[in-house]
From Swiss-Prot:
One Pfam match: zf-CCHC
Name this protein carries in UniProt: Zinc finger CCHC-type and RNA-binding motif-containing protein 1
Record's keyword annotation contains Transferase: no
SMART domains: RRM, ZnF_C2HC
Molecular function GO terms recorded: RNA binding; zinc ion binding
Gene name as annotated: zcrb1
Coiled coil: 161-196
Subunit structure: Component of the U11/U12 snRNPs that are part of the U12-type spliceosome.
Biased segments, Acidic residues type: 146-161
Biological classification of the source: Eukaryota, Metazoa, Chordata, Craniata, Vertebrata
Main localization of the protein described in the UniProt heading: nucleus
Zinc finger residue extent: CCHC-type: 105-122
GO biological process, one term: mRNA splicing, via spliceosome
Domain RRM: 10-88
Domain of life: Eukaryota
């Protein structure tokens, strides 16, 4: 038989069950045949007492057929149980709808506080292991590293190679200027010395008398 969740094909109708049997008991009883999705025991609207009828929804059709064949005409706590594939009365969608029990402070089976239906003292088959809680996928906010904006600086460093080259050029230029300065200074000194010698050198004046004797003048 093909699988797939189809309430009209994978729901078992169980009747003549003990009135004291709870939803948890039916779940535990039918779980041996396959994955049980939901158990609903029909209760009186006013007294909330069981009417001895239950619907068990399985995950697949094969499990439902196995359960119906095994439980049909079986003695259960002194009562002859009847089981068959449930006939769809058009309310399958309503039946499959999951109920959310927001109040977790009290048991929905007996209404008492301090325990849940899985561990209710009224369960004839004892406690049932609660289904694993579905972990809610929390959207983790990926904390992106803060982008540190670089501070604007007016004093930007130059390339070391360019810096050393400029220093060499400047040094060479300074040497050239220094040499040129020295040359100019030496030329000026030489010019001044020559002028000074010419000034102090005695000049020979010819005698007015055209004599062979020369007169020295300062």
């Amino acid at each position: 038989m093909s699988g797939g969740l189809a309430p009209s094909k994978s729901t078992v109708y169980v009747s003549n069950i003990p009135f004291s049997l709870t939803n948890s008991d039916m779940h535990k009883l039918c779980s041996k045949y396959g994955k049980v999705v939901k158990v609903t025991i029909v209760k009186d609207k006013h007294t909330r007492m069981s009417k001895g009828v239950a619907f068990v929804l399985f995950l697949d059709r094969e499990s439902a057929y196995n359960c119906s064949r095994s439980l049909n005409n079986k003695q259960l706590f002194g009562r002859m149980v009847k089981a068959s594939i449930a006939i769809d009365n058009g309310r399958a969608a309503e039946f499959i709808r999951k109920r959310n029990y927001t109040d977790k402070s009290k048991c929905y089976e007996c209404g008492e506080e301090g325990h849940l239906s899985y561990a209710c003292p009224k369960n004839l088959l004892g406690e049932r292991e609660p289904p694993p809680k579905k972990e809610k996928k929390k959207k983790k906010k990926v904390q992106q590293p803060e982008e540190v904006e670089p501070e604007d600086s007016e004093e930007e460093g130059e390339d070391p190679a360019l810096d050393s080259l400029s220093q060499a050029i400047a040094f060479q230029q300074a040497r050239i200027e220094e040499e040129e300065k020295r040359r100019k200074q030496a030329a000026e000194d030489a010019s001044q010395a020559s002028t000074s010698e010419d000034t102090h050198k005695p000049r020979i004046k010819k005698s007015a008398y055209f004599s062979d004797e020369e007169e020295l003048s300062d």
